Amino acid sequence: MSDPESPLWVATLLRHHKELKQRQGMFQSRHMEFFRFKRFVRALNSDEYRAKSEREPEKYPPVRSEEDARDVFVSLIKAQLVLPCTKLHTAQCREHGLAPSKDYPHLLLSTKATLDADEYYVWTHNPKTLTDYLTVVGVIVGILAFVCYPLWPHSMKRVVYYLSLGLLGLLAVFSALALVRFVIYVLSLAFCSERGGFWIFPNLFEDCGVIASFKPLYGFGETECYGYIKKQKRRKRKLEKKKQ
């Protein structure tokens, strides 16, 4: 007799399985991970699941055929651990009053699960990970350490004092750099306005890594900015798709 908690055990085991190749999308205004049905079948046929199934068949039902895989997946749907969904395209997003996003595609709940190979499903099961527990412990320890600051030894207080001064110094340097950078840009417009002005660290406020923010050392206009280059690459990909 199978364990009534079997769907939960299966979902927990395969929640972050590499075979799912899951992505993040926006489902009911929340970031949720979704995958294709055929990917879940592959995860059920993986060595990891097979080994678990052989040791604990009550928790992890054996999968010997495609029909077995469908039965296991249906049990997850009935337990509402996964839900069928549709990935909306740009035009469909606008029809539903949603802003299209390439990074996080919008997902719409489907009324029926057909179990087609390319049908999308979204996870509603989000078990706590070790990282989540460590984060909670870290926050609690941090709060207790802050509350107990008066009891700290003098040497530790001195270290915190110098660290605070260092952080304030970095903030002051960054603010001064931003101010000097802007002043130089405004002055440069009188000499090279046709090139978009002269920038020191053109990527300083771009959405990129810390090291990339300071590369290149200087540039003209926005043509060397990370955001502009990324936008041009997207435009190029769109043109190539249209040609195809």
UniProtKB/Swiss-Prot annotation:
Membrane topology per record: Multi-pass membrane protein
Membrane-traversing stretches: 133-153, 159-179
Keyword terms: Endoplasmic reticulum, Membrane, Protein transport, Translocation, Transmembrane, Transmembrane helix, Transport
Compartments, as annotated in UniProt: Endoplasmic reticulum membrane
Cytoplasmic compartment segments: 1-132, 180-244
Predominant place of localization: endoplasmic reticulum
Signal peptide, first to last residue: none
GO cellular component, one term: translocon complex
Lumenal membrane side: 154-158
Pfam families registered for this protein in UniProt: Sec62
Gene Ontology MF terms in the entry: protein transmembrane transporter activity
Gene Ontology biological process terms in this record: post-translational protein targeting to membrane, translocation
Assembly: Part of a complex that contains SEC61, SEC62, SEC63, SEC66 and SEC72.
Similarity field: Belongs to the SEC62 family.
Function: Required for preprotein translocation.
Name this polypeptide is given: Translocation protein SEC62
UniProt organism field: Eremothecium gossypii (strain ATCC 10895 / CBS 109.51 / FGSC 9923 / NRRL Y-1056) (Yeast)
Gene it is expressed from: SEC62
